A protein has these predicted regions:
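Sec-dependent bacterial lipoprotein signal peptides
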Residues: 1-21
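An aromatic- and glycine-enriched ligand-binding surface/loop that stacks and positions planar moieties
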Residues: 24-87, 183, 191-194, 208-357, ...
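Flexible, polar/acidic helix-loop-strand segments at domain edges
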Residues: 91, 319-396, 543
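Conserved, well-structured interaction surfaces
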Residues: 44-63, 86-156, 171-184, 190-203, ...
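Long, intrinsically disordered, low-complexity segments
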Residues: 23-24, 110-113, 185-187, 254-311, ...
Length: 544
């Protein structure tokens, strides 16, 4: 919808605020000049499209707020850390229900979208429009509502399941449904939505939900809950659409020039200078180049990238500790700023803690020496405070790797043809061209697939955050010691900055200098304390 959404987002945003803030006021009985009541609104297809845009805008796939959550929860893993607020507490075992910075915004945004979707579905039949068009927009709204429940259930577990517009009294007495009930609802809704969604759209409708997106979210949810055979079948449905494909590019996928790629199945809808993105070209920018560098990539992620002979750094004869970034998987260079190696805008990236800060974020100097490069555009000249860069949520590479993992875990036969259709298709893109995988031993292949997901999707939609939880390795990886770039070969006598016994930088964040233990219960977020105060029927997650 990005091409058409620019024309209607502002109107829709204002309109939907006035229409849908009614959960706190008797707005149906009033019609001030700045608002519209239901009796004067649901009269035409144009009204429908405005309401639809308002739901897109409210949801997690439609805003810069989601980009912030990608930043935060991608940085709530063993890949990187986020410098600010409550997310850094996740590493230290002190994440609390009152840490509202991201816990509350996820909950509120999701239920705002769900309310808008319910309101839409209760009123759409009033509109006289083509039956096929009506079925399509209903499918879009059912998808958008189901996506919010998918996201809520992934972050919190069971949550209140609301499928109609509620009064304030009803809303404040809702109890949590079981996780299984939420998952069943989501799968049913996504299945129904996929039937009425088109496989493709004209360029003028780019950004509106497609059949592949509904199937991809469904497959991902099935995989999270280890329903492997169903997940494999659903992923195969997407493959058989013959709509999406692996882009030969990699770096450009995460820039504005890549937004039309056939690899992208679902992404945010960001519009420069209207509903812009402050993260890609400012907050993720290293301070060395004038940004805030709000993320700190850990050494463990850097080490996960293989050598370009396809072997880990511990096994490859190409690895040279004195030149650790030479001869690596090309995705490393596209994803991470590497100290004294990456050249960006004609300047060599330097990150030693002794350097005088050259950026605008003096208190925010990086704590590991490594910076987030994915999504940062070298030749960007626009407004860094409101760029138009979308953020990818699901792309076709995840479909292929998800299909392989689902086939592997369901016990199906693993053949070279299957590997070539999936993981080798991903690794073989022109810009990457890593050696093909030939391993068919299940245990060994499982580790290869997991590492491939880590490097292919690093620093994207919180894929790693979800993966380490569904693989049941969350506490294992989160309780390790994190560190950054190597500062010295003589750590036993080095006193300038805190280092590990290997001479690697420890920085200053809680994520690096642990003060607590991450517990298994921390795999789920706490229900926002503010919501429990309003609705005592809500039970808090264990451990909080």
């Amino acid at each position: 919808m990005k091409l058409i959404i620019k024309k209607i987002y502002v109107i829709a945003g204002i309109l939907m605020v006035s229409l849908l803030s009614g959960c706190e006021t008797d707005w149906l009985d009033e019609q001030p000049l700045e608002s519209l009541s239901a009796s004067t609104f649901w009269n035409s297809k144009d009204d429908t499209m405005l309401a639809l845009a308002g739901i897109y805008r409210a949801g997690h796939i439609g805003t810069n707020a989601y980009t912030n959550q990608v930043l935060c929860f991608t940085s709530a893993t063993d890949d990187s850390s986020y410098k600010h607020g409550s997310v850094d507490n996740m590493y230290s075992g002190y994440f609390k229900p009152g840490d509202v910075e991201n816990v509350l915004v996820i909950w509120n945004r999701a239920y705002t979208t769900i309310f808008r979707a319910n309101y839409f579905l209760e009123n759409i039949e009033k509109v006289q429009m083509d039956v096929a068009d009506k079925e399509e927009v209903i499918a879009e709204v059912r998808f958008l509502r189901a996506y919010e429940y998918y996201y809520l259930s992934t972050m919190y577990g069971g949550v209140p399941l609301v499928t109609k517009v509620l009064s304030v009294e009803e809303a404040n007495t809702q109890k949590r449904k079981s996780l299984q009930e939420i998952v069943t609802f989501c799968i049913d809704e996504l299945t129904a939505a996929a039937k009425d969604l088109p496989a493709t759209r004209p360029d003028t409708e780019r950004g509106r939900i497609l059949k592949g997106a509904a199937l991809a979210v469904k497959a991902k949810l099935l995989m999270i809950h280890q329903r492997w055979a169903e997940a494999a079948t659903t992923y195969k449905e997407i493959m058989d659409l013959n709509v999406h494909s692996i882009d030969p590019r990699y770096k450009e996928l995460f820039e504005e020039v890549g937004e039309t790629s056939k690899e992208i199945i679902l992404s945010t809808n960001i519009i420069a200078n209207i509903y812009g993105n402050t993260h890609n070209q400012l907050n993720w920018h290293p301070d060395f180049y004038g940004g805030y560098q709000e993320t700190n990539v850990f050494q463990g992620l850097v080490d996960a990238f293989l050598m370009n002979d396809g072997l880990p750094i511990e096994e490859s004869p190409l690895y040279d500790p004195a030149h650790p970034f030479d001869n690596r998987d090309p995705r490393l260079y596209a994803s991470i700023f590497l100290p004294e190696y990456t050249e960006f805008r004609g300047i060599l990236y330097l990150a030693h803690p002794s350097l005088t800060n050259k950026g605008i974020g003096t208190p925010l100097r990086g704590a590991t020496g490594y910076g987030w490069k994915k999504y940062v555009t070298e030749n960007y000249t626009g407004n860094v405070y409101s760029s138009g860069d979308d953020v990818i949520i699901i792309r076709y590479a995840e479909v292929l790797l998800g299909y392989l993992e689902s086939k592997l875990e369901s016990g199906d036969n693993i053949t070279q043809d299957l590997l070539d259709q999936t993981i080798n298709e991903v690794r073989g893109r022109e810009a990457v061209h890593m050696p093909p995988v030939t391993e068919t031993d299940r245990d060994k292949l499982r580790e290869i697939v997991r590492n491939e997901r880590r490097v292919e999707f690093c620093l994207e939609h919180p894929t790693r955050y979800i993966d380490i939880r569904r693989w049941d390795i969350y506490t294992e990886v989160m309780n390790q010691q994190f560190y950054g770039m190597k500062l010295t070969d003589t750590p036993e006598t080095y006193t300038a900055y805190p280092v590990e016994t290997t001479g690697k930088y420890r920085g200053h964040l809680k994520s690096i200098n642990k003060t607590g233990t991450v517990k298994p219960e921390s795999a789920l977020l706490p229900i926002p304390q503010y919501e429990i105060n309003i609705n005592p029927e809500l039970e808090q997650n264990p451990g909080y």
